[in-house]
Structure formats: C-alpha cells, structure tokens
Amino acid sequence: MSLPERPGGSPVYEHRNVYRNSPSRRPRPNDIETGFQSVPRAGHERGKSVSSYAETISNPHANTETLPLSPTHPTASPPPHSPDQPFTRKRSLIRPERNRIDKDHRNYHYHKHAANMETMPSSTGNDPILENVDVSTEPSGGSQTHGSFADSSPPRHHRSRKMSGDDQEKGNTRVKSRPRRSKSGKITKETRHRKSRKNPATAEQIRPPSAWNVYCAIVTFWCPDFMLKCCGKPTKAQRRAWREKMGLISIILVIMAIVGFLTFGFTATVCSAPPERLRVNKVTGGYMIFHGVAYDLSTSHHPPAEGIPLRQDGTGANVLFDLPEKHSGQDGSFLFQNVNGHCKGLINKAPGSDVPTNSDNELAWYFPCTTFNQDGSSRPNFTNPYYLGYACHTSANARNAFYVGLKGAADVYFTWDDIRNSSRNLVVYSGSVLDLNLLNWFNESEISVPDRFKVLRDQDSAVNKAIRGRDVTRMFQSPGDKQVAQCLEEITRVGFVDTETVGCIASKVVLYCALILILSVVGTRFVLALIFQWFISRKYAASKTSQSSDRRKRAKQIEDWSEDIYRAPARLPGDVGSSAMGSSDRTSKRGSSFLPTTSRFSAVYGSDRPTGARRLPTTMSSQGPASALLNPNSIYRQGNDSRASFLRPDPYSSAASPSDGPGPAGFIHDSVVPQPPSDWMPFGFPLAHTMCLVTAYSEGEEGIRTTLDSIAMTDYPNSHKAIVVICDGIIKGKGEAVSTPDVCLGMMKDHATPPDMVESFSYVAVASGSKRHNMAKVYCGFYDYGNKSRIPVEKQQRVPMMLIVKCGTPDEADKAKPGNRGKRDSQIILMSFLQKVMFDERMTELEYEMFNGLWKVTGISPDYYEIVLMVDADTKVFPDSLTHMVSAMVKDPEIMGLCGETKIANKRDSWVTAIQVFEYFISHHLAKSFESVFGGVTCLPGCFCMYRIKAPKGGQNYWVPILANPDVVEHYSENVVETLHEKNLYLLGEDRYLTTLMLRTFPKRKQVFVPQAVCKTTVPDKFMVLLSQRRRWINSTVHNLMELILVRDLCGTFCFSMQFVVFVELVGTLVLPAAIAFTFYVVITSIIHSPPQIIPLVLLALILGLPGLLILVTAHSWSYVVWMLIYLVSLPIWNFVLPTYAFWKFDDFSWGDTRKTAGDKVKKGGIEYQGEFDSSKITMKRWAEFEREKRARSAYFGSRENVVGAPGGWAVPPSHAQTDGYYSDA
C-alpha cells in the first residue's frame, strides 16, 4: 500500500482508474460522497496537534488561484466539460446527496464553505473522491505571503465536514452573495462596484417592478406621490413603505371579510330563509290543510250555501269559526279533490253508482266530501248531510276560487320519526308524504278501485309492511307502478317530508367542519401542552441542581423570587457545580477512564448500532483529550508547566516551540478558572462550554448589575461558562450619569490588558453606506461584583468576562450615538466570529482580538464553546436555569435552540403590567409547550434563549455548524433591506427572525421550551410604551409567520402539521380585530334574541376556559386565576386596540418609546443610506497570518518574566525556521 498522499498531490478524479466511476463499484466508507474520511496513519505524517487549530500540510500548488467564496464569481462554478476529458458521473434525481446545490438551496453557503476546506490524508492510499472542486483550493481564499509558509489548513478532527446528503440539514433560504476578497485580505474594487450596482436607487431603475409592487400601486392609485410628500413622506423609501402597508392592510381586510362572510353571510347566502313550514299536528289557529299545504282562512268568507248562512254584517260566514262544527286545523283535501289526473283509468265508476260523470267518463269525486283530522284519527264517513255531492266543490267558480284565488301559507312537513309512527300508515314518494289509510275512505259501492290499492292499504299484508314508514320512490319506477304512485300522490298526500336545500346542507357542513377544526386545534394544543408539561419537559431538566428538587417547593420559590426584580433567590448556589474545584467526588458523577472503551478493531467513525449500555452525550470536551483543556496552572495538570506542550505534536519532545512565548498560549491569565476532567459530571450529564451573551444598549448600572449578577451566580461551573457583553454604541440612558459602556467596564477586574491601553479595531457592521465600517474595543478580564454587592463575598464566583464596546469610527465620534448599529449587529459580531473560528476562515482585526482575549481569560480555545445563551441587559436569571438549559442541549443533540419562561417582576406596578401577567403565562405554558412537542417553537424570545453553535453529527469527531452555519450568518447579516417585509423582519423582530431562520435552515432539528429555566424582567408600565412594544412584536410575528408558512419540511402533513398550525396562527393574528368584534356581536345578539347561538357560545367558552383549566391541572399558583380574569377583561385591548394600531403602523420601523436615551429623537429606521462603504479600511486575515505578523513585528518573542505566572525565561529567541511548523499548525 502506498503512503498516504495529500489530495492535491495526485491526478484529479477524472484522470484516475475508470473503475472508480463504474456503477459496479460499491461506495466505500472512505469516499467523500459517503460523508466519511479515513484517519491518517501514524508514522507517515506528523502527529496531530491537540491545539484548537487545524494541522496544515504544505500545499504543492501554492501559486494556484484559490476558489473564491462568492458564488457569483465565474470561477466558482466547475469548469465546462471538454471533449478530451472522460465523462464524469451524472447527477441523479434519486440520490439526495447528488442534488444540485444552487443559490436557492438552503445549504448553499455551507456547501461553498465546506467545498473549500482541505481534507485529511487518506490511510488507504486512495485519494478522496472530490466532485466539482478544484484540486488546489485554499479555504476562504487566505493570503499566501511568506511563500515558505503554507496556510491551507485541513479541518481539525472535530471540525465540520461535508456530510452525505442524508446527513445534510434541510431548509429553504434566500441567498446573498459574499464579497470577493483579494489575497491581501481587502475587499476588492469589483466588490464595491457590485455593491454600487445593488444600490436601491439604481436597482429599482433596472429591475422591473414585481407583482407585489404593481398590486400596491393599484391599491394606492388614488394617492399620488405629490400628496404623500405633502403628508410627510418626502423620501422614496417612505412612500414605498406606505404603499406596501396599504397593500398589506387591503389583504388583511379581505381576509377579515372572508372570515366574516363565512361566519355570518355564508349561511344567509346559500341557505336563504325558506318558506314558512308547519309541522304536522302543530297546525292550529286560522289554518286548514289541503293536499299537504296549510292555508290561512282566518279572514276568509264563504259564499252562502246549505249550512253556511250569512253573518249579521251581510258577509259570508268563516268556515273555521262560525259554523257549529269547527274546522280549524283539520284536513280539507276531500273538499277539493284532485280527480281525473293520473288516476284516470285506475279509479272508475262502480255499476249503479250515483257519482256524476261527463262524456269522457270522468268522475266528479272519489271520496266523501268531508274533513278529517290531521293526525289520521278520523274514521271514514259516507253520509251526505244535505244532498249528493254536498261540499264537493265541483263547479268551475268554486274550483277557480280555490286553485286560483287562494295561496298556500306554509307546507306541512313530517319528520322521519312522524313517518315511522306505528299508528299511521305513511309512505314517502318523491318527497311527498302519502297516507295509505285514506284509501279506506273509498265507497266501493260507488267507486271501483284496483286490487293494488287494497293490498297497499292493508296493514297486515307483506307489501304494506315492506313499504310502511319508508321512501318508496325507487320501488315505484316501472311504468305501471309509477302511475299508481302518481295517482296516490294526487289523492292521498297529507304533507311533505322534512328536507333541507343543498345550500343549507352545505352551510351546515361548513359550519361543523369549521367547528371540528377549531375544536381539534384548540383541544390538541391543550392536550399536547399538558403532555409536554407532565412528561416530555422533565427529561430535558437536570437531575440535580443547587435549588430544591421538590417541584412544588421550587415553583413556590420562583413565584416569590419573581415578585421583585431585585429580590434574591431563596438559595444561592453552593457546593453543586459552583466551580471545578467546588464539588467533591460524592456529588460528582464520574465514570472510570482506566479501562479502554475501544480497540484496534473498533469502527473508526463509530457505529450506529445500539449498544446495551447507554452512551453518554457527546460534547467537545468528551471527544478530545482532557488535558487539552487545561491551562498551565491547572491543579489537574501534572508534569509540563507550559501550555506549549499541548501545541506540539509530541508533548514529550525536547524541541523548543514558538508557542512558549507571549502568544495566546503564552500569556493565559494566572487567575483563569481551572478546567476539570472531561468525565466530571456534577449534574448528571457531560458539561458543555457555554457563552453567555448579554446585549446592552442604554441600560443603567442597576439593570446591568442585576443581569450580570444572576448569570455569574448560576450554579453552572465557571470553568464552562463565560460572559460576553456587547454594548451597542457609546450611549447614555435617559437619566443616567455615565454611558452604558462605562457602566459595563466598571464591572470588570483583573483585566488581561489595561483598559487605557485597549485599542479599537475595525469590522464589517450590519448597516448600509458608510456605516458598514465600524470599530469596537475588546476588554477581557473577570466579573467584578462591586463593593456594594448584595451577594456575600464567600458566595461570589470568579467568572471570565469579555466586553465588546462598539465605539464607532473617528468620523462619528461627535455624533449622538457613535458605534450604534443595532442589536442584530451585536449578535452578528459573535455569530460571525464563531463561524470564522469553526471554519478557520479569515477574520477581522476585531475577531482576532476577541479570539485571543477569550483564550486569555478562559484558558481554552474559543472553538470549544458549543452553546451560546442570549440574555438582554434587563433580565435576571434564576440560579439553576442555565444548568437546565445546557442539560437539554447536551441530552438531545437534535435541539438547536431553546428558551425558558419569562416572568414579570413588576406585576402590580399599574394596570398595564397587570394585564400582561397572564398573557406571558399562556404564551409559554400553552403555545410554546404545544410547539415543543413537535420541536418547532416559532419564537425564542431574545431576552432569554439559547442556541447551539455546533452539533455532533455521525461518527466520532464530526461536527456540523448550527448557529455558526454560513447560511444562517449570511442571511441574518443581510444589510440590503428594501421591502416592507424585510424591514419588519430585520429591523423590528430580529430575535424572532433568527428563530425563523434556524427553522428554515434546519427544519428537521428541534427548538423547544424548557419550563424549568426561568428568568424575570420588567415590562412596560405605561400604555404608550406597551403600545409601541406590541406594535413591533405583532408586526414581527406577522412577517415571520409569512416566512415560516413557506417551509415545507416542518413536522407533520397537511392539517396535521406545524405548517398548518403556522397558517392558522397567521390567519388568527390577522383577523384578531374582526374576531373580537364578532365575539361581542354574537354575545349581544344571543342575549337580545332567542334562541341563542349555541355553537359560537360553546366555542367561545372553550377557547377562554381552557387556559384557566391549564392553571389548575399544571398546579401553578392560584393567583393566576385572578390574573386570567384581568386578562379576559382586557381582551378588547389585546385583540382590537393593539393589532389595529400595529397594522396601521406597518411602515414604522422605529423602536418608539421602548428604549429611551439621553437626547434621543425617534426616527423611522431602515430608510437612510448615508455615504459609501470604504472596504479598504478593513483587513481580513486568518488567525495564523495575524499571529505571524504580530510576532514578526517583535525582535524576539519576549521573556518569560513578562508572562504572568510563568517561571523561567528565554535564553535565546527561537529561530524563524522553528516557527514554520507552528504557524502551519495554527
């Protein structure tokens, strides 16, 4: 077997053996396509350094132009195929790992970064299979000065690798190209030219208007630009935002109209008011029934006849009330018989009959001309009161008066229960109810009837039993039977079956489907929220912390603690996990490391087969040697006193190493918190290094002190947490004596560099125009609790702290807010830094200082950090919250983000704070608990959340970036924000948009809510401040839900999916004002009119009552019942006032009254473009290049006397040749 070779040292893939391209060859584990690589064999190459930087092997193609990161560059795409080259393997539509990665792919930027990373040498003698990647590529296009040095570094053993398609994360993202950089680390003029072409003013002239802009122009055609200029919209961006706002409002109004139509208008439209109908046996008063129709005869007058005299007023008598025999409510069908129709030929005159006939042998009547009861209780009566044919109304005048002069008032209907009544002999034919007992009224001495009638009326016959109480329409379809049925319909119809129109049936179907859907969503959310609270959430929590293990007692302590923002917890962290030194072996959970866990026959990359023993979760510390985490002064260290031994390939070598000098390894702070062994588990799970990011803007000393105290006093070990504070500009809060950066700097001690010697460094900010260039200072040290601290001295813990102050360029030193670029820019500073560290990419001078500074005060490389906690500067964290959050992250590697519960500390300050208490409660314990079941929490609040920087993937030592993923960083750092949608995402709801971006990039990973993690904060106590805050939150919610609804890969399918839940939530948010108006309308109409609308009232009771039930079954404080009642009273504010104001302020991108500063003037953000970005002021190089130049500027590396706590000194400065290996290693 040949020696291992570097990928660039052998022919390209297409020139090698054709067998590797053959379909008959099965993929091997060491192929790049499979996502795995072999571990280099010992003895053929230099041993791997345990430093936190990648080994670099010299590049034989050092002069080859590197592949730029920018996907728009022509050399970024693979070279076209030439005829003299062998055909390469075609891409398949079936295998997902071979899908085309274009600009619309969710992992586009990640693939670009991964493609530019060098690979480790192969131990099999075969080169890794690389597709569409130049052989000689340099990651991030690093500069190659000092020709003898090779700066192309392969990824470390724990760096992210390009995985197979099945392992790649999925999601759809919008792509933004990265600028191309020159070899010197500067952004080229071509980039500036491309930037100028992206100027909104010129872009709008070239780019054709989109369908959305055309729609907005049509909606607002009535308001031309000159009118908007007169109304305070002078700039084009403001006018465009206003038109887009009106377009959105028009769509919201249409949705409200649709919901209103479905609620009230749909039934009235498709099921209009039917004609009046009267149920059988309910026809009374002035009605009389004829052939199934009730006629109103209460005001009728019958002409004089036998037995019907004139009244005293000379008018005819009323046949219902004036005669001795009352006929009100009776059936008079025999008085106006339907003869000689379909019955002609079936019913004939009997021999010797007195029934009159005409020349066509048509009979004058069939039945005796009398009335009968509508309930069918009358018996046949064949007597004639006065003369033959009395009351038969056979004259033309009489029949015209009835058939033409009278109009039916209502149909008489039978329900199917009435038809199945055993005392009646009823059947249904073509919707008409026929009474077969009326066939018994035939006087067979006068009339001859067919035998079929006799069989049908006989209740003892088999035929009658088969059809009685049923619909016989289908049974009487033959020609002979159809005539019989039609004849029966003419002479025996007593009413109609109870039916509804198709429209009424459709309206009921829609109503009940909507009811079932809403009840299902509401009920499912409630049940799944309970399941999460009772069962799922408990597996995320730490088994033990410094607080009480009794859940009820702990809940009571939290409620008492949250009553006041400055109230201390019931128990301060003590022995458990306070530091690496603070726990005894009895409280630690350590496993034995004496016996080996692998052998030479073990799989290199691990096995996916389940084992009998439960494997511990994977962390950075657990994958590497424990000694790699230790600093020179660690009590766990034995032997070598210099960290340089960890940077050398051979720790026992006697050769000098350049890292023994004053580099990052040379002046680690003497007070650094020692690192414990990797198997030390004080809480029952492996520890993971965590950054605690605190973003500050204009907060005062009291607010910041509260936050930092709570973070520093969490019971999570100080060896595994570091506080990172980023101040967004030199800003002084309203009523404060000093600026916020000065306040934060005063809370530090034991600085690695004296504060007065700290310089400002440049970086690329998230802004437009000249503000893209910003400068910041990096202060590193330890947290200082202060002389007046409420925390006892013996409880104060030593926590490393790094302060980043955005001070701005010298040009803006005299402006109101120098350095201010927004909270998103502060987050991007850290996220971009983490990306550069993980991929070993070129970084700015600021990031280089952050790297070294963090290493100084923590004693470990920044790429050991796996998790970042994000906290606002006015939030206080419960002591064991950080432990519970890290526990969830470590126990479930699929979790990429989580949040805890935020409680209100000023509940009783005013009615404004009182109405927010239950709203906060229900948003966490109902909404977020439900979403956590599916791992899709749609909003991780920026005041208290945690994200995973990178996650273990696949086999041993493989990690994929999560928060540090290039796709997340690229999209979150978008600085060209033009549309109303983008401005609401990036300028108002950046915290929520980060959550959306994570779900969109990694739809198969989880974002959950950890109820055991609790923080408290103060909420607005004035209505105008609340109005301004909720304006931002509601508008951000709408636009983020619009983004999430397009993500198809979320959990579930169709109506049983998170995508459908997001759709329902979006529609529910948009129609909130209409919904509360409809609710009041239903309640008022139900009180005034009768009968009440039962279904809407029941639905309303369920929606409003289930949250109260949630309080009871989850055993929360009974005080929340009172807060719920206050919330219900304030529903018009939550559902009408706040959403309506927010929708009307869609084009307002300012933060309003939420954050006040000294001399602040509220402006609408996101609409100014000031100056031009000069990229030449920003230098970007890899860490090794920065470090080389820094050391080259010194005549020698310095003496050990200059290093804090370092014994001994340098006798002779090391030669330049001795540093070559180190630089390539770094």
Swiss-Prot record:
Similarity comment: family membership: Belongs to the chitin synthase family. Class IV subfamily.
Basic and acidic residues composition bias: residue spans: 94-107, 163-172
Basic residues biased stretches: 173-198
Keywords, comma-separated and alphabetical: Cell membrane, Glycoprotein, Glycosyltransferase, Membrane, Transferase, Transmembrane, Transmembrane helix
Enzyme class: transferase
Compositional bias of kind Low complexity: 66-75, 649-666
InterPro entries associated with the record: Chitin_synth, CHS4-like_dom, Nucleotide-diphossugar_trans
Tissue: Highly expressed in conidia.
Biased composition annotated in UniProt, kind: Polar residues: 49-65, 134-151, 580-601, 618-643
EC number: 2.4.1.16
Gene Ontology annotations of biological process type: ascospore wall assembly; chitin biosynthetic process; protein localization to bud neck
GO MF term list: chitin synthase activity
Identification of the protein by name: Chitin synthase IV
TM helices/strands, residue ranges: 246-266, 516-536, 1060-1080, 1094-1114, 1118-1138
Disruption phenotype: Leads to delayed conidial germination.
Glycan attachment points: N381, N421, N443, N640, N787, N1035
GO annotation, cellular component aspect: cell septum; cellular bud neck; chitosome; incipient cellular bud site; plasma membrane; prospore membrane
Top-level taxon: Eukaryota
Membrane topology: Multi-pass membrane protein
Gene field: ChsIV
